[in-house]
């Protein structure tokens, strides 16, 4: 049985979205057990799953405006902290939260702990592409600054994730840069390029540009945390803007526009689904001793369900265990 600790009080739509997502996941997957950490009185009205769900009551929670490290240290009974402690103690195999990202990173680093020889765990998420396959990108903001060595480790971690969780054989690894030529980039990117191209265990395809990311140019894209977070926000914002503009044009375009939209409804639905990052799950703080996954703060029940499904796959394929073995002896 795979045990997943859920911070039921984190996020904009907590606890309703978290609990409703849990209801669906428990109904669909018979091999998971959920530990819900939070205010029992607020959780129970939404809980329909009677089996394999246990509520661990606490009224303390970490707010979105709390200082991350301070909150983790001072709010020892917060739902997020208790979920992380359950993972560390072996009472749960993984944890999920839609709460304060910085606090979750701190809980992952200081409570769950890093895999030996991984210097900086990175935040990894599967991003949408036009072709529908998507690509895994890290780091998406766990670290503001990185070295070339960190980027090399991210390439290995990303390859492990793409191959084991998403089933991609020999995933293509690209280094995000301001040009595709090997001579492009600042000293960080140039040094990282040398490390990646010299690693025969990676299917490194070279530099990739941001404009090509959604065209299935690579399966894994490596970036420093600052750049990766900026790209993530750009992709999210662009997807929302495109769908918003389409809706505005259809509603304001009169009868012909509405008729055209009706005729194209299947195609438009496909476009919407291809840009929906929530269906892929959450962002994994990869490089820790157990899966710690952050779902978007505004996640609905569907996104929470998708994240639980993602965690289940991570546990089923033992991607973290394989990463531990890979890094048990430092490669560099």
Swiss-Prot record:
GO cellular component terms, A-Z: cytoplasm
Function: Catalyzes the reversible formation of acyl-phosphate (acyl-PO(4)) from acyl-[acyl-carrier-protein] (acyl-ACP). This enzyme utilizes acyl-ACP as fatty acyl donor, but not acyl-CoA.
Signal peptide residue numbers: none
High-level lineage: Bacteria, Bacillati, Bacillota, Bacilli, Lactobacillales
EC number: 2.3.1.274
This protein's encoding gene: plsX
Organism: Streptococcus sanguinis (strain SK36)
GO MF entries: phosphate:acyl-[acyl carrier protein] acyltransferase activity
Family of the protein in this entry: Belongs to the PlsX family.
Pathway: Lipid metabolism; phospholipid metabolism
Name used for this protein in its record: Phosphate acyltransferase
Keyword Lipid metabolism: yes
EC class name: transferase
